[in-house]
């Protein structure tokens, strides 16, 4: 599973 970067 992947999620949007914290940038």
UniProtKB/Swiss-Prot annotation:
Keywords attached to this entry: Hypotensive agent, Metalloenzyme inhibitor, Metalloprotease inhibitor, Protease inhibitor, Pyrrolidone carboxylic acid, Secreted, Toxin
Tissues/organs with expression: Expressed by the venom gland.
Summary of the function given for this chain in its UniProt record: This peptide both inhibits the activity of the angiotensin-converting enzyme (ACE) and enhances the action of bradykinin by inhibiting the peptidases that inactivate it. It acts as an indirect hypotensive agent.
Similarity-based family: Belongs to the bradykinin-potentiating peptide family.
Protein's name in the database: Bradykinin-potentiating peptide 7c
Gene Ontology BP term (one): regulation of blood pressure
Pyrrolidone carboxylic acid found at: 1
Transferase is among the record's keywords: no
Entry's localization field: Secreted
Keyword Transferase: no
GO molecular function, one term: toxin activity
Predominant location: secreted
GO cellular component terms, A-Z: extracellular region
């Amino acid at each position: 599973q992947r999620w949007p970067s914290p940038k």
